[in-house]
Amino acid sequence: MRQHVNPLSRFFQLPLQLPSPGELFDHPEQPIHLDIGCARGRCILGLAELNPGWNHLGVEIRRPLVTAADRDALNSGSGNVRVLFCNANISLESWLAALPNDRLQRVSVQFPDPWFKRRHRKRRVLQPALLLAIAAALQPGRELFLQSDVLAVIEPMVALTELSGCFTRPESDARPWRADNPLPVPTEREQYVLEKNLPVYRVLYRRNASPLPDPEALKSRWQELDNPAETVFTDI
């Protein structure tokens, strides 16, 4: 059972200055995979072991999970994985903007907390400003991977991503949901869901060459749609 925290509470609204890649990794020049909402870090730790030529950063808003996961990261001695505590919508934008060109090569948002009610829209992890910060940091062809076991959670993420115009799905991927996970290590939640023979909804995007849209226009368009995914999927 996952424990929710309210990202809008005053404590989680305090911005944090996150360490630079040079402070986090032994080889900061390596490509970075950023996993937003990494929980206990099973996926990001496993990927770091399998891919020593990449750096792997997990961020998580639940501090006890971060403490345990980052301890494991440091104890691994690999020098290519860390887990940090932060509210992604408050502290990640400046970190992303400061990255060297094409350093960030993959972003994943996997099984975020299910704030699916419309009145909880602002509590969702993938907000317009964060999506645009991700899009600005990714060069064309780099990846954004989304997955959830709750349709009402992933549909708004897909809708927002589609509305931005900054990302394109591979033509070979099944619609509306990708059949498999492109990452070789499942998260804790994914493994639990699959063991229960429950569905997982996945979408892989690649950054295209389109310019960033106006942030306020994107936010307004996203908020005015009661069921944005329904509108967007008709065009896929």
UniProtKB/Swiss-Prot annotation:
GO molecular function: tRNA (guanine(46)-N7)-methyltransferase activity
Binding site for substrate: K117, D149
Keyword Transcription regulation attributed: no
Catalytic activity of the protein: guanosine(46) in tRNA + S-adenosyl-L-methionine = N(7)-methylguanosine(46) in tRNA + S-adenosyl-L-homocysteine
Keyword Magnesium among UniProt keywords: no
InterPro entries given in the database record: SAM-dependent_MTases_sf (IPR029063), tRNA_(Gua-N-7)_MeTrfase_Trmb (IPR003358), tRNA_methyltr_TrmB_bact (IPR055361)
Gene Ontology cellular-component annotations: tRNA methyltransferase complex
Protein known as: tRNA (guanine-N(7)-)-methyltransferase
EC numbers on record: 2.1.1.33
Organism from which the protein derives: Parasynechococcus marenigrum (strain WH8102)
Pathway participation: tRNA modification; N(7)-methylguanine-tRNA biosynthesis
Role noted for this protein: Catalyzes the formation of N(7)-methylguanine at position 46 (m7G46) in tRNA.
Keywords: Methyltransferase, S-adenosyl-L-methionine, Transferase, tRNA processing
